[in-house]
Amino acid sequence: MASLQALRGTRDILPPETQVWQWIEQTAREILGRAAVQEVRTPIFEQTALFERGIGEATDVVGKEMYSFRDRGDRSLTLRPEGTAGTVRAYIEHGLASQGGVQRLWYTGPMFRYERPQAGRQRQFHQLGLELLGTADARADAEAIALATQILQALGLKNLRLDLNSVGDASDRAAYRQALVDYLTPYAADLDPDSRDRLERNPLRILDSKDERTQAIVAEAPSLHDYLSERSRQLFEQVQQLLTHLGIDYRLEPKLVRGLDYYTHTAFEIISSDLGAQATVCGGGRYDGLVSQLGGPETPAVGWAMGLERLVLLLQQGQAVPPATLDFYLVSRGAIAEGQALILAQKLRSAGFGVELDLSGSAFGKQFKRADRSGAIACLVLGDAEAEQGQVNLKWLQSGEQQTLDQSELLQDSDHWRSRLQAARTVSPVEVAPL
C-alpha cells in the first residue's frame, strides 16, 4: 500500500515553526486591535458564484486556479481562493452597513488555488487580511497601508519597498482598456502565450507580465495615468500626501495592477528584495464597487492581504525571529520529586509563567540536554532532597549561574522573577522547515 502523505502544494506546519506563525498572528492581532480592527471568521468554502461575481470570471484565479466541486445537493461550491469576497458577503448578509460608520475587520486563515508549487507559493496557503468598509476617505487608504507597514516593521522585516498606483474607476479603466488593446493588437504574435490569452479577456494583466519580450512591448504602452479622471487624480494625490506625512516611503509604479477585477483607484504592493520571483508579501487597494456588485448597498472600501508563507520564508532567512516565550524547563528525578514537580509546574503556570515539564523520567543528564534545546530562559531542578525541603534549584541557561531557593519564593514574589526572566531573555533563533 502506498504511504499516505500530504498532497503536493500542501505542507504540515510543525513545532518549532508553529511558534513563528503564532508570533506573526499575535503581532498583527495586537497592532490591529490597537486600531479598533476586529476579527471576522468566514467559511472556508462558499458558493462558486460569489467568486465568479466578486473576483471576475476573466481573471486567472477564477478561470484556472479555483478548487470547485459539486456537493450532494448539486450545488457548485469553491474553496476560497482569497478572503475579501467572503468578508464582503458576510458584511452584506449580516447587515453590517446598517450599523453606520466604518466597519474595521481583519481575518486570517487558509486559502486555496491550483498553482505550480514553489518557495513561498502553495496550493493551500495562508493570508492575513484587513478590510475597512464604508469610507471613501483617502485617509482610509493611508491608514490601511500604515497598519500593514507597522506589522511588517514589528516583525523586524527589512529590505521592503512600497509600490503604489491608481487604477482609476470603472470609466477610467474602460477607456484605458480600449487604448491598451489598440496598442497591443499589432504585437499580438510577439506576446507570450498568457498575454495573448489575456489580450481579449483581461488586457490590464498584461502590464505585469514577467516575460522579457512582453515587458519590452509594454514599456512603450499608453499610461493608465493619462486616462484618470480628475476625481481619480485628486484621490491618488491625497493618498500620496498622507503617506508622505506619515513618513512612509513609496515608489510610483504606473504599471502595477492587481490580479482581481474588483480593485478601483488605489492599488499597492509591499515587496521584499529578499524573495526572488515571489517578492510580494502584501498587496491590496480600494474596491469601491464590490459590495454593490455582490448585492449590497453602494459601499466604498479598502483592504489588503499578506501572504503568511512568504513572511515565514523571510523569517527563515534569518531577518528576524520571535522572542523566546518559555520561562522555565522543569526537570525532576525521584518518586517524591516527580509528583511535586507536576504540582509546581501547574502553580507556576497559574501565576503566568511559561513552564515545560520534562515527563521522560530519564536521567538528569539527558533532561539537562533537552533543557538546553528547549529555548527556556532558566532550568528548574527538583530531586527528592529538594522536594522534601520545599526547595528547587534554578539554573540560568545562558550564563550558567545557579542558585537554590524555596519554591514559595517563585510563587510569592512572581513579579520579581518575571523581571529577572525578562532581563535574561534574549532573542534566539527558531528553526523553520523549508517551505
Curated annotation (Swiss-Prot):
- Give EC number(s), comma-separated: 6.1.1.21
Any one Gene Ontology molecular-function term assigned to this protein's record: histidine-tRNA ligase activity
A Pfam entry, by short name: tRNA-synt_His
Give the chief site where it resides. Answer: cytoplasm
Catalytic activity entry:
tRNA(His) + L-histidine + ATP = L-histidyl-tRNA(His) + AMP + diphosphate + H(+)
The terms describing its cellular component in GO are: cytoplasm
Q: Which Gene3D superfamilies match?
A: Anticodon-binding domain, Bira Bifunctional Protein, Domain 2
Compartment(s) of residence:
Cytoplasm
Q: Can you tell which superkingdom this protein's organism belongs to?
A: Bacteria
InterPro entries referenced in this protein's UniProt entry, alphabetically: aa-tRNA-synth_II (IPR006195), aa-tRNA-synth_II/BPL/LPL (IPR045864), Anticodon-bd (IPR004154), Anticodon-bd_dom_sf (IPR036621), His-tRNA-ligase (IPR015807), HisRS-like_core (IPR041715), HisRS/HisZ (IPR004516), HisRS_anticodon (IPR033656)
Q: Name one GO biological process term.
A: histidyl-tRNA aminoacylation
EC top class named in words: ligase
Under CDD domains, the record lists: HisRS-like_core, HisRS_anticodon
Listed A to Z, the keywords are: Aminoacyl-tRNA synthetase, ATP-binding, Cytoplasm, Ligase, Nucleotide-binding, Protein biosynthesis
SUPFAM superfamilies in UniProt: Class II aaRS ABD-related (SSF52954), Class II aaRS and biotin synthetases (SSF55681)
Family the entry assigns: Belongs to the class-II aminoacyl-tRNA synthetase family.
- Matches recorded under NCBIfam families: hisS (TIGR00442)
**What is the protein's quaternary organization?**
Homodimer.
Its protein name is Histidine--tRNA ligase
Protein source organism: Synechococcus elongatus (strain ATCC 33912 / PCC 7942 / FACHB-805) (Anacystis nidulans R2)
